[in-house]
From Swiss-Prot:
Necessary and sufficient for nuclear localization: annotated segments: 251-301
Protein name (Swiss-Prot/TrEMBL): Zinc finger protein 24
Species of origin: Homo sapiens
Residue numbers carrying Phosphoserine: 132, 142, 274, 292
SMART domains membership: SCAN, ZnF_C2H2
Keywords assigned: DNA-binding, Isopeptide bond, Metal-binding, Nucleus, Phosphoprotein, Repeat, Repressor, Transcription, Transcription regulation, Ubl conjugation, Zinc, Zinc-finger
Function: Transcription factor required for myelination of differentiated oligodendrocytes. Required for the conversion of oligodendrocytes from the premyelinating to the myelinating state. In the developing central nervous system (CNS), involved in the maintenance in the progenitor stage by promoting the cell cycle. Specifically binds to the 5'-TCAT-3' DNA sequence. Has transcription repressor activity in vitro.
Reported impact of residue 286 to A: Partial cytoplasmic accumulation
Domain SCAN box residues, every copy: 52-134
C-alpha cells in the first residue's frame, strides 16, 4: 500500500466536521511523508479534547493493517498532545489530567470537563470550588441547601444531556447529596455525633432521596467508604425527614414535563433540549451554557487572577486557590480527622489521612 493511500485512509477513518476534516487534509497534503512539524498554525486546530477522544476510542478494525494503525494513533496522539508547542512538562500534565479525570465518579467527570481545565491543578481547583459551594460553613443553612440543590440539578442536567439512563441519574443525584453530608460530618462532628465543643449535634434533615440506610457505593471527592446511616456523626434516630407541603414546583418543562420550583432552574434545564450555549468566548469560539463557566474559561486567555492575597500579594484565578493559600498565613486547619483529631489545612490531605486509617483497619482484620 502506498504512502498516499495510507494518508487518504487516515482522513477517511476520522469522522470530523467539515472544518476539522479540511484542516487534517491540508496538514497531510503539506506533510506527505508523515514527518513531525506541520506548517499549520496550532491555534487553528480544533480542541485537543477532540483528538484525545479519537485517540482513546480508535480501534484496530478502523485501519487496514498494523502499520497504518500505529501511524494513525501516532498522528492522533500528536494532535492531542501537540509536542510542537508544548513542553515535556505540559505534555506530562495533560496525561496526568486525563487519568485524574478518568478516575473521578461519572458526575464529577462531566463537571470537570465542562470547565475545560488545562492541567491537574486547574482540575483540582474546579473540584475545590464545587466543594466550597456545597458546604460553606460561613453561609446560612438554607442558602447552603439551596446552592446544593442548584449544583445537583446542574450536574444531573449535564448527565441528562449525555443520555444517561434515569436510574443512573438517580444514583448520581443521591451520591452528590450524600457527599455533602459526609463532608459535613468529617468537619464538624466526632464519632459520637458531637460537635467540636462537645455538644450534641442538632438533628439533621436527611435528604429526601436518601431514605435507605446504605450509603451509595461511590462517594464523591474521594471520601472513604466508611460511613453508613446510623454511624459516626449521624446515630440512628437522629435524622428527621421534613416536608414542606406548601412548597410547589410551578414551573413545568413543556418538552419532558419536569417540574421546577424556580423559573431560572427551568430556563437552565431547557437548554438540555435546545442545546443552547448562549455564552461564547470571543477568543477561541468555545460556547457555554452558563455565564459563570465562560468567565472562568476566559481567564485562560487573559491570565486574569482577580483573587489577591493581602498578606503577600500573590494572586489567583480562583477564589478557592486564594482561600487555600491564606491558610499558610493564618495557620488555619479546618479539616479535622474524626478518628484521631489531627487537623489539616487542605481537604485533600484529610482524605489521604483517612485512607491510612482505613488501611490500618483492613490490616487488623487480616491479622485476626
Amino acid at each position: 500500500m502506498s504512502a498516499q493511500s495510507v494518508e487518504e485512509d487516515s482522513i477517511l477513518i476520522i469522522p470530523t466536521p467539515d472544518e476539522e476534516e479540511k484542516i487534517l487534509r491540508v496538514k497531510l497534503e503539506e506533510d506527505p511523508d508523515g514527518e513531525e512539524g506541520s506548517s499549520i498554525p496550532w491555534n487553528h486546530l480544533p480542541d485537543p479534547e477532540i483528538f484525545r477522544q479519537r485517540f482513546r476510542q480508535f480501534g484496530y478494525q478502523d485501519s487496514p493493517g498494523p502499520r497504518e494503525a500505529v501511524s494513525q494513533l501516532r498522528e492522533l496522539c500528536r494532535l492531542w498532545l501537540r509536542p510542537e508547542t508544548h513542553t515535556k512538562e505540559q505534555i506530562l500534565e495533560l496525561v496526568v489530567l486525563e487519568q485524574f479525570v478518568a478516575i473521578l465518579p461519572k458526575e464529577l467527570q462531566t463537571w470537570v470537563r465542562d470547565h475545560h481545565p488545562e492541567n491537574g491543578e486547574e482540575a483540582v481547583t474546579v473540584l475545590e470550588d464545587l466543594e466550597s459551594e456545597l458546604d460553606d460553613p460561613g453561609q446560612p443553612v438554607s442558602l447552603r441547601r439551596r446552592k446544593r440543590e442548584v449544583l445537583v440539578e446542574d450536574m444531573v442536567s449535564q448527565e441528562e444531556a449525555q443520555g444517561l439512563p434515569s436510574s443512573e441519574l438517580d444514583a448520581v443525584e443521591n451520591q452528590l447529596k450524600w457527599a455533602s453530608w459526609e463532608l459535613h460530618s468529617l468537619r464538624h462532628c466526632d464519632d459520637d455525633g458531637r460537635t467540636e465543643n462537645g455538644a450534641l449535634a442538632p438533628k439533621q434533615e436527611l435528604p429526601s432521596a436518601l431514605e435507605s440506610h446504605e450509603v451509595p457505593g461511590t462517594l464523591n471527592m474521594g471520601v472513604p467508604q466508611i460511613f453508613k446511616y446510623g454511624e459516626t456523626c449521624f446515630p440512628k434516630g437522629r435524622f428527621e425527614r421534613k416536608r414542606n407541603p406548601s412548597r410547589k414546583k410551578q414551573h413545568i418543562c413543556d418538552e419532558c414535563g419536569k417540574h421546577f420550583s424556580q423559573g431560572s432552574a427551568l430556563i437552565l434545564h431547557q437548554r438540555i433540549h435546545s442545546g443552547e450555549k448562549p455564552y461564547g468566548c470571543v477568543e477561541c469560539g468555545k460556547a457555554f451554557s452558563r455565564s459563570s463557566i465562560l468567565v472562568q474559561h476566559q481567564r485562560v486567555h487573559t491570565g486574569e487572577k482577580p483573587y489577591k492575597c493581602l498578606e503577600c500579594g500573590k494572586a489567583f484565578s480562583q477564589n478557592s486557590g486564594l482561600i487555600n493559600h491564606q491558610r499558610i498565613h493564618t495557620g488555619e486547619k479546618p479539616y479535622e480527622c474524626v478518628q484521631c483529631g489531627k487537623s489539616y489545612s487542605q481537604s485533600s490531605n484529610l482524605f489521604r489521612h483517612q485512607r491510612r486509617h482505613n488501611a490500618e483497619k483492613l490490616l487488623n482484620v487480616v491479622k485476626v
